[in-house]
Structure formats: C-alpha cells, structure tokens
Amino acid sequence: CHAPCGHYAAVRQFVEAQGRYEYGAVNHALCAAIRELLKEFAVKVCQLESLLRAGSLSIAKLWYHIQPSMDTFALLYRVTAHVYGSIGGLVLNGIQDVMARSSLTTAQELCEYLLQQASQPYFETVSRWIYEGRLDDPYAEFFISEHMAGQRAAQNDARAGARSRDERVGGLGADFWHKHFVLEERSVPQFLAASREKILHAGKYLHVFFSVGGKQLQEPGNQGRLRYSRRQRDCVEAIDAAYRRASAALLGLFMGPPPVGL
C-alpha cells in the first residue's frame, strides 16, 4: 500500500501547493480537474466502507474496485511530479509529455482529459489575442509577452505622429511588429507550435489596427471556441482564419485613407 498511498498524498499536496493564486490559471484549471478525481475517489472509498460494514467486501472485490484508482493516482503522480513548479504552456507540455510516454489507452485518455481542462484558460487568452489583439495575461503564462522597451518606443512614435501612409507603416507599425511583442519559444505549447507565428502576427496586426485606426472590425463569422483535441484540425483552421482576418484588416487600414489625426 506504500506506493499507492504515497501517490495519493503527493497528488493532494500538489493540488494544495500549485492551486494557489500565483501559479496561474492553467494550474488552477488543472488542480480543479484533479480535485474532481479526488472527490470521485472519496465517494468510492465510502461505498467500499459500506460494503465492508455489511460484510460483503472480499479481498478480491476490494482489489477489483480499487485497482483502477491505483492506476489513476499512479498516473496523476507522474503528471504532477513532471509539471511541479511550472506555469502556463510548460504545464501543458508536461502533461503532453506524460501522455506521449503512456502506452495504455486509459492513461492517454486521462491525460487528454487533463489537457482539455487545463488548456481552457490558455485558449481563452489565445482567443482574446487573435480575435481582439488584446494581451490579457495577468500570470505571465502566454508564450507572447509585451516588451516594455518596445512599448515605450511605440508610444514615442505615437506622440510624434506620422504624416503619411508610408510613415505609419515604417513608424508606429514597425515598432509594434518588431519591438512591442515578443514570442517566448520555450513557453509555446507543443500542440500550438506549428501555428505560433500566425498566432503572434494575428494579434500584432489587430493591436496595430485598433491602436492606429481606432476602427470597429466586423466579428469573424466562423469564430468558434478554441479547445484542445488530439485532432487539431479545427483549431488550426480557426487560427488560420483569424490570421487572414487580421492581415486583411491591417492591409485595408494601410491602403485606405489615413485615420483622423494622423
């Protein structure tokens, strides 16, 4: 019983430690998913206790009921040990690493469930970025960060103003593109790696569009909720569509008449 009990205790400790505020939304979502599994296990223990008191719990029946839970906590121990101390995309990558090393279907399904739950707040950040050009990342979990030196340079350009369309492209826009936002390669989730540049530029383009143009942009007609799936086609297509929309918006801004005040 030593190993299973140790796994259970370690998982509970992880939830208590890494569920704290400073560990970010991805960890909060992961810990919430694990808490649900802990609750399910507590219910099972109560049911087994009732069978024991009724005199109908044999060793064979106990083993039959408890073995799946032992496997679950062994896997949860591997996951939590692998991601301990990490935040954001590194947590998601850690779960995916454990899933890739697991040969049992049940283990892969559990890892996929954890990824789906833990990635929800991450995809909300991605959505705000690629659909609104808004970087809302209070825990510094996202793989795109705001570079303060670039921000100051962009603000200086904005105060100086641009007097022609070409100046707008080479002035404020250039600083936003090259200085204002930075892609942190180490923090990119594996399942978004192929789309990371389009995600970066879609948000950048919209950020410039709204900062320079101050215009309303039509909502994307096919905007769907981004979510994790081992079949990533739908997510990739949504990101591609968001990138095309952002590119068209910025092109239209630079090809059209200068915004008022520029």
Placement of each model-derived feature along the sequence:
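Long alpha-helical rod scaffolds of large eukaryotic non-enzymatic complex subunits
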Residues: 1-262
